Each structure stands twice: as structure tokens, then as C-alpha cells.
């Protein structure tokens, strides 16, 4: 792009940041002193508003940039992410949404601790929630670095590094000043912008091929260099048995992980009733379903119009496929139309990243303040306000996410989110389901379930090809790879469920029938819910 066009792009790109900071500043003038206000916005959002906010929270950089990029590079196999992310919401709708809204108050640990000894359960669940959130944040940081480096016309490490630092600083400002109310409105605005941008690009791609989807697919296959194999399963996950098991592992993580994501669970506390929570999910499924169908068109459109080689040359993992597609659809590099469309898409993608990191940071800082701090602080001293602790925690989590984002900047963002989903499905989902549905579940079972899924998931990732042993690893110069799969879900998810069962059957604790009955009635009817 020319200097003038880059200036235009940067002005459009900066507009959303300005709008979101105005929203945050306006909200910060309202009283944010109570935990209820800071964590849930006083539960004043309607099902439609919360549905748009959930969609805004869920349609992350992994969805917009990563999935389309993977489809552009590996075709059919990249669609697994689109299908997995969408199907996961059926688990949320039928098993989690209403029950979590009725049983909890602010965090996942509230649901589990309702019938267990609070301290060990809150420490375990809080630790797990922070681990999942940080992994998810890293993916958003990587997406931001790739996007802004492309926007500025450079792919140097310094540009990406400063972008990651800038995103981290913005997310801390959003959460510290605005809390849930500002975060929710940022997510709603972002969801509208993202859907509008995605619809526009999808229509332009289909118009380029005169509405002939068959022609679009065959053109993508021809330019891919793989022929019809580009449109069939197996290009990425069918080479050998290890790849096939990786396929199964990733599918399990995507389908089961959503119900264990802390920032998604926290959204159910922002509506007044369980019925509103369920209606929120219905709204979210409609919005998210339409979006993921369009990412498939964008992925194959990038393969057909840009070509996998050009996408890979811009970013090895395909994270810049959609911005490059927008540039081409608008008229190409050097044209005003191409630059404006590119800048709009870049601004929308950046809005996506900012909104998601704000939601994740709020959820993880809530876990630190409401679960970890409240459980670990020494008695006798003057306790600090939960909200004050949450604001400090947001800063600490931001620093950790920035550091890891700098380390992982060359990985595909959809792939990174797949790892976060695997940890969520391994550590959070088993304890959540056992707490809601198993009458005999005990405190030991809850603690073992969390750590029995969390520790294996993290250790297997560290020992996988993601970290070492291959040219695409985080540390390509060393090799301590012992686990062959890139996603640990196939092993760590069953281990989480097994550990919860084993901890319960070996526990000498007698399950509290009265508290279980109370939790069951509350989860099903909403009686006594906050």
C-alpha cells in the first residue's frame, strides 16, 4: 500500500479504538464499587443484548482470522474448526446455560462450591480458569500482532511485539475502568461490526463467482496445488494414524471445551433469570451459526482468489488470509477501494480481538479475586475489596498474556485456541457436569477432577510437537517431544473425568444429601438464585 492509503487505513483502524475508549470512560463514571456491578453489570442485560455479547465474546480472532486462514491452506480439514465451534453450543444450550445461571453468582467455582468444602474447590477451579484464560488470551495477542504488522506494511518482529504490548494495555484499561458493563457493550458493538463485515465479504466473494459455489470450490482446489484432495478429508489430518488421532482429539476439544470456558460461563450471570440465559444462547447460536458458515466461504474464497502460496507468504499459518482477500475484493493493492475495504476488515478484526481479550481478562481477574484471593488470604489482616483485587489481577494477567503472546507469535490463532479448548474441556467441564448431575460427588472428587484434567493437558502440550521437535515448534532448536499429538484432548479429557470419579469413590467424605437436594432444586427452578 502507498503511504496515503496506509494513512487512510490507520485512521479507520484507530476509529474503533477511540469509540471503545469513549464507551469505557462513560461507563467508568457510574459506580463500579460493588462486585455485582463490576462482574455482572447488575444483571440488567436483555437476552438479545446478552446473545449479541456472547457472540461477540465467542467470535474471536481464531474464528475470523485463524479458521479462514486454515481453510485457505488445507481446505476441507480446516472446516473442522467451524463445525466444532458451532456444535459445541448444543452442549451449552442443553446442559449448562440455565443450570449455571441458577447455581452460580460470578464464576465457575460458585457452581461447584455450592455443595462442597469451599476453600480447596475454589483454589482448584480458580487456578484452572486462569490457565484457560491465559491460553485463550495468547491466541488473541498473536492475531493482533499479525494483523497490525500487515496493516503497517511490515512483518518485522518489532512491529508485532509492540502491537501485542498495545493490545495488552488496552484490555487492562477496559477491564479496570469499565468492568462487565463496558465489556458487554464493546462486545455488542464488535459483534455487529464483525457480522456486517463478514456478510459484506461473503457477498463480494459470491458475486465474483456469480453465485456459483461449485465454481468457487473448484477454483480453490485448482489454485491449492492439491487438486480434488483439497476438498476432501485428510490433507491435514489424514497422513498417518497420529494425524487421525489428532483430528479426533481436536474435535473432542472443540465440541466439549466451550462449556468450560470461564468467559462464556460468566456471561450467563449478566441476565436476570435462567430463562433469559437460555434465550441468550438461542440468540448466540443463530448469530454464531451464520458467522461460521460465512467463514467457510471466506476461506475457500481466499484460496481461490489469493492462493495458498500468497497467503502462506504473508503469514506462515494463514492468519492474514481474510485481510488479503478484502484487499483483492476491493480492487487490489494500491487502489482506494482495496485499501478502504482492507482497512475496514482490519479494524473489525482488531475490534474482535479487543472485545474478546476484555471479556477473557474480566473472567480471569474475577476468578483471581473471587476465588483465589478470597480463599488464600490470611485471616486477621484487613481484607481488600474484591473489585480492587480484580483490577490488580487484570494487570498481572495482561503482563503474562503479553509475554506468552510474544513467544507464540508465529503459530496459527485457531490452533492456539484449540489448545485452550482442550484445557477447558479437560479441567472445567468434568467438575461442572459432576457437580450438576452426580449426587454422590465429593470435594476430593472435585479437586482431583480439576487437577486431573489440567495438569495432564498442560504437561502433554509441553511435551508435544507444538513446543519442540519440529521446524514449526515454539523452540525448533531443541527436542524434548514425547507426546505425538498436537492437541492433548483425546488423553486429558478422559483423565479429567476419570480423576473426578476416582477421587469420589476413594473419598471418606459422606456426600451432603441436603445440600445436593438444595442445589438440584435451585438449578432446575431458579429458587434462591442471585
Question: Can you describe what each PLM-predicted range is?
Answer:
Residues 32-38, 110, 213-218, 414-417, ...:
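Short, Lys/Arg-enriched, Gly/Pro-containing loop segments at transmembrane-helix junctions
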Amino acid at each position: 500500500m502507498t503511504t496515503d492509503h496506509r494513512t487512510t487505513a490507520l485512521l479507520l483502524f484507530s476509529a474503533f479504538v477511540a469509540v471503545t475508549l469513549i464507551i469505557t470512560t462513560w461507563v467508568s463514571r457510574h459506580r463500579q464499587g460493588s462486585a455485582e456491578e463490576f462482574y455482572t453489570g447488575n444483571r440488567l442485560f436483555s437476552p438479545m443484548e446478552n446473545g449479541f455479547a456472547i457472540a461477540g465474546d465467542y467470535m474471536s480472532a481464531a474464528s475470523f482470522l485463524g479458521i479462514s486462514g486454515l481453510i485457505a491452506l488445507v481446505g476441507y480439514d480446516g472446516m473442522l474448526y467451524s463445525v466444532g465451534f458451532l456444535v459445541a453450543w448444543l452442549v451449552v444450550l442443553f446442559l449448562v446455560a440455565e443450570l449455571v445461571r441458577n447455581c452460580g453468582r460470578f464464576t465457575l467455582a460458585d457452581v461447584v462450591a455450592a455443595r462442597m468444602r469451599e476453600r480447596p474447590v475454589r483454589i482448584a477451579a480458580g487456578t484452572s480458569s486462569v490457565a484457560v484464560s491465559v491460553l485463550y488470551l495468547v491466541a488473541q495477542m498473536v492475531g493482533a500482532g499479525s494483523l497490525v504488522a500487515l496493516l503497517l506494511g511490515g512483518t518485522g518482529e518489532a512491529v508485532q511485539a509492540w502491537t501485542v504490548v498495545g493490545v495488552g494495555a488496552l484490555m487492562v484499561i477496559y477491564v479496570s475502568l469499565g468492568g462487565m458493563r463496558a465489556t458487554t457493550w464493546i462486545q455488542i458493538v464488535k459483534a455487529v461490526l464483525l457480522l456486517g463485515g463478514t456478510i459484506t465479504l461473503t457477498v463480494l466473494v459470491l458475486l465474483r463467482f456469480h453465485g456459483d459455489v461449485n465454481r468457487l470450490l473448484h477454483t480453490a482446489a485448482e489454485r491449492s496445488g492439491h487438486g480434488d484432495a483439497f476438498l476432501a478429508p485428510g490433507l491435514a489430518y489424514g497422513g498417518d494414524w497420529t494425524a487421525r488421532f489428532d483430528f479426533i482429539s481436536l474435535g473432542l476439544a472443540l465440541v466439549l471445551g466451550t462449556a468450560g470456558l470461564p468467559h462464556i460461563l460468566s456471561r450467563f450471570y449478566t441476565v436476570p433469570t435462567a430463562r433469559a440465559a437460555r434465550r441468550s444462547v438461542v440468540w448466540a447460536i443463530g448469530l454464531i451459526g451464520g458467522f461460521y458458515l460465512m467463514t467457510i466461504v471466506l476461506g475457500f474464497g481466499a484460496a481461490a482468489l489469493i492462493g495458498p502460496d500468497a497467503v502462506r507468504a504473508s503469514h506462515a499459518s494463514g492468519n492474514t488470509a481474510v485481510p488479503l482477500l478484502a484487499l483483492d475484493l476491493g480492487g487490489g493493492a494500491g487502489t482506494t477501494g482495496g485499501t478502504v475495504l482492507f482497512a475496514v476488515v482490519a479494524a473489525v478484526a482488531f475490534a474482535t480481538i479487543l472485545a474478546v481479550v476484555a471479556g477473557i481478562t474480566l473472567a480471569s481477574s474475577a476468578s483471581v479475586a473471587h476465588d483465589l484471593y478470597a480463599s488464600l488470604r490470611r485471616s486477621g489482616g484487613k481484607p481488600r475489596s474484591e473489585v480492587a483485587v480484580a483490577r490488580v489481577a487484570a494487570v498481572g494477567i495482561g503482563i503474562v498474556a503479553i509475554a506468552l503472546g510474544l513467544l507464540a507469535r508465529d503459530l496459527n490463532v485457531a490452533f492456539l485456541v484449540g489448545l485452550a479448548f482442550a484445557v477447558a474441556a479437560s479441567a472445567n467441564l468434568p467438575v461442572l457436569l459432576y457437580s450438576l448431575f452426580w449426587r454422590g460427588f465429593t470435594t476430593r472428587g472435585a479437586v482431583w477432577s480439576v487437577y486431573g484434567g489440567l495438569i495432564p493437558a498442560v504437561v502433554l502440550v509441553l511435551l508435544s510437537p507444538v513446543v519442540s521437535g519440529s521446524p514449526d515448534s515454539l523452540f525448533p532448536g531443541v527436542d524434548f517431544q514425547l507426546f505425538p499429538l498436537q492437541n492433548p484432548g483425546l488423553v486429558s479429557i478422559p483423565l479429567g473425568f476419570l480423576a473426578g470419579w476416582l477421587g469420589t469413590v476413594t473419598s471418606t467424605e459422606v456426600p451432603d444429601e441436603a445440600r445436593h437436594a438444595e442445589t438440584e432444586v435451585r438449578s432446575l427452578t431458579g429458587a434462591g438464585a442471585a
